[in-house]
Amino acid sequence: MKSFNPKSILIIGMAGGLARITAHLLSKKYPDIPMIGIDSRKIKNDFHLKNLEIIQMNYSRGNFEKLFRDKNFDVVLHLGRMSHVSTNPGFNLRKRLNLNIMGTSRILDLSLRFKIKKVIVLSTFHVYGALPDNATFLKEDAPLRGSFNYPELRDVVEMDQMATNWMWKNQNKIQTVVLRPCNIIGPQIKNVITKYLTSATIPTPMDFNPMFQFIHEYDMANVITESIRNVPTGTYNVANNDVISIREAKEIASNSPQYSLPLFIVGPMAKALNKTFLNIPEYIFDYIKFACVINGDQIDTHFDKRPIRYSSREALELLTLE
């Protein structure tokens, strides 16, 4: 792959914690390169970065097209996938489908039309699904079975498939990288697994104790930053080499002893709490039942120095210090 120095960067999903950290790393690495961060959600503008402009806008075709036309981007970071834990409870499956799938389609089409040099799309390891016959360490060519049992993962799987198909179709015209990280955790990441790990209310399953992988938010932002220059077109898992059981992970993250119950009790218990304040989707209980561990060796071959600093255990320990 012929590396290049970016001249202008668009960050989509700027209200998210990962995008915020990535913007800081990019500003440090490329202090003279203009960056624009956009989001349809309200963005807390406390960055104090001279080369970053913040814009709140709806993800409509007209808004996107004007932005791409007016600004001469050569790198697009699509970090704006709407997760299942949203600050807006009105984001149901239909709205997520529109934002994640249709929004991604617009971004990719405009990137090709306006001759963007590189696009990085943030996906997730959830696309593989947590099933009893999963391989020990899933590689990038493993089937995407995440939505087999849970329709709420449909948008995640379809977005990944669409981005991957588009990537190979246009590989001679534009560099595209699809990242499938393991569980991202950190003080600025408000996702499903963080809610589960830090909840003192939801117990661990007595009858299951699968292995998990965790990556610290700073490390994931560093992977994204370094991928701009170093990682060629392709789909890549992003994960630590170490694993840790869900019981031990929850004990570390909550900084307190845990109690366990049979899974058939844990699930209904969480559903009842979801109606009040917890908002943990049902699919997470397959992930605390069956392991979904990924192999992240492929992306490491493209880095002179591995951008992941913290182990899974260290990432969990850092979560308790914040």
Regions found by a protein language model. Give the residues of each.
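Conserved C-terminal active-site "lid" loop/helix of NAD(P)H-dependent oxidoreductases
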Residues: E217, S245-E251, A272-R306
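N-terminal Rossmann NAD(P)H-binding glycine-rich loop of SDR-like oxidoreductase domains
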Residues: F4, S8-K29
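NAD(P)H-binding glycine-rich loop region in Rossmannoid oxidoreductase-like domains
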Residues: M57-M102, L110, A130
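Mid/C-terminal beta-alpha module of Rossmann-like enzyme folds, strongest
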Residues: A221-P281, L319
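Substrate-positioning beta->alpha
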Residues: D155-E158, I189-I193, P205-I228, T233-G234
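Amphipathic terminal alpha-helices
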Residues: K2, Q298-D300, R306-E322
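Active-site Tyr-X1-5-Lys
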Residues: F148-V177
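Conserved Rossmann-fold NAD(P)-dependent oxidoreductase catalytic core, especially the SDR/UDP-sugar
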Residues: S105-E152
